[in-house]
Amino acid sequence: MLGRFVANGRIYEGSFEIDGELLVFDGYEVPLTAVKFLPPVVPSKIIAVGLNYIDHAEELNMPVPEEPILFMKPSTAVIGHDDCIILPQISQRVDYEGELAVVIAEDCRNVPETNAADYILGYTCFNDVTARDLQAKDGQWTRAKSFDTFAPLGPYIAEIDDPSKLGIQTRVNGKVVQKSNTSNLIFDVFQLVSFVSSVMTLKAGDVIATGTPAGVGMLKDGDVVEVEIEKIGILRNTAVKIDRQIRCEC
């Protein structure tokens, strides 16, 4: 695993292992209960992909896109594991969207699909939080996708040889609301790295969010949302209304 975390009042960054209830880092063992995971990277940009699961396209009764549909989320929206998703007053419907995220290893441009794996640092969980009513109102996605706290990322980066058959599910208050597999991606991870890098330079630490499966839905004040991906782990966040509590410990 790769990532950033706080333990004993200090910030650590690098490679570590999780052994049961312990985090093992540079020869030291720290109870996971004493660890606060930070966002594993601070990307220069987040490139997200719309309508990239077959089951999600079927759910919306929309045709499969001929090429990836790209949009951006700002790095200022990033939060980590156990941080709070702030539900803005201006929106009456904020949705979860559990996703697999690809973390770029080094600066790259025009990467061939066959070489894409060489430029991937690893994979992590992502939640493409969206103010759905604003998305519909605006007719484009920037405002709806860009509020602070609307890009939960983590808890850490896993190095995975084959990301093509990973189980993915999202839970709200313990109830499974999304369940799929990355084998249902319309454009796979390597296709996405190649396509995105043909459009823009990818910087080390940049994130490509690969799209969400069927089952997106609304978050309410106090909801606990978890995105779990096979071979990676669980990203957990709590939704909080901004008029109730601006800063929270959760």
Curated annotation (Swiss-Prot):
UniProt-annotated binding residues for a divalent metal cation: 97, 99, 128
Keywords tagged on the record: Metal-binding
Keyword match Metal-binding: yes
Gene Ontology terms: biological process: small molecule metabolic process
Recorded GO MF terms: catalytic activity; metal ion binding
PANTHER family for this protein: FUMARYLACETOACETATE HYDROLASE DOMAIN-CONTAINING PROTEIN 2A, FUMARYLACETOACETATE HYDROLASE DOMAIN-CONTAINING PROTEIN 2A-RELATED
Family named by the database record: Belongs to the FAH family.
Protein name: Uncharacterized protein AF_2225
Annotated source species: Archaeoglobus fulgidus (strain ATCC 49558 / DSM 4304 / JCM 9628 / NBRC 100126 / VC-16)
Lineage per the UniProt record: Archaea, Methanobacteriati, Methanobacteriota, Archaeoglobi, Archaeoglobales
